[in-house]
């Protein structure tokens, strides 16, 4: 379909977009640099119009996907789409035999429940019973399917063969759906941070903080 179809990756709703839908107001877009350097001024202006924290937990639970406007049972919807992605999209795109689907599901669940977010390929290999190379492949399949976010120590686009330093569930709605009531709040906030910044910023691993943004800002969440 090259030359016939234009491909476009559409991210989920940002917290700003969610607030606009919920309040029927329009809020300005700020760059990350603006938020770091002018955060007090920005917060003061926003609080004149809305109290974001009143909407924050709802966003973490169901606000990333606009389907929440129509779908009342958002947990069921998210779990159904996770299963569709694992059982149909990834096998079709990556030629995985159906008998290995349980391994993909195990790996996603382990990733969601690991509050350290560290990547131990040997341990994961033993837990799901596949080779180290297969674990790396599975992680990249789920990254491409937007189920996981993988962090490397560089921002090289050709990192698919490298071991990631950290892994996170792609967004807080997915994390809440997989873990239900047993969600670590720190990991949830990190997943939120990545879901907001990854579409427009370069996020890499750093030993000196949780994230390195655009090679310049070290952020601890």
Regions flagged by a language model, labelled:
Residues 23-176:
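Interdomain hinge/linker elements that couple catalytic modules in large macromolecular machines
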Residues 1-4, 23-25, 183-184:
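Short, glycine/charged-enriched secondary-structure capping and boundary segments
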Residues 2-16:
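A short helix-turn-beta junction within AAA+ P-loop NTPase domains corresponding to the substrate/partner-engaging
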């Amino acid at each position: 379909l090259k030359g016939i179809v234009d491909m476009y990756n559409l991210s989920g709703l940002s917290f700003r977009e969610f607030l606009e839908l919920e309040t029927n107001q329009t809020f300005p877009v700020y760059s990350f640099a603006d938020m770091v350097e002018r955060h007090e001024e920005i917060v003061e202006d926003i609080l004149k119009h809305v109290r974001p924290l009143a909407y924050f937990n709802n966003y973490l639970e169901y606000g990333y996907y606009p389907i929440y406007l129509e779908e009342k049972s958002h947990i069921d919807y998210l779990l159904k789409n996770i299963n569709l992605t694992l059982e149909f999209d990834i096998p079709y795109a990556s030629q995985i035999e159906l008998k290995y689907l349980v391994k993909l599901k195990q790996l996603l669940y382990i990733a969601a429940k690991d509050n350290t977010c560290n990547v131990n390929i040997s341990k994961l290999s033993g837990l799901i019973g596949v080779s180290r190379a297969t674990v790396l492949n599975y992680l990249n399949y789920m990254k491409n399917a937007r189920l996981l976010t993988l962090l490397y120590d560089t921002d090289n686009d050709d990192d698919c063969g490298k071991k990631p330093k950290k892994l996170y569930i792609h967004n807080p709605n997915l994390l809440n759906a997989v873990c239900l009531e047993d969600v670590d709040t720190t990991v949830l906030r990190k997943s939120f941070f990545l879901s907001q910044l990854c579409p427009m910023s370069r996020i890499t691993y750093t030993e000196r903080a949780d994230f390195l943004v655009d090679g310049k800002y070290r952020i601890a969440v």
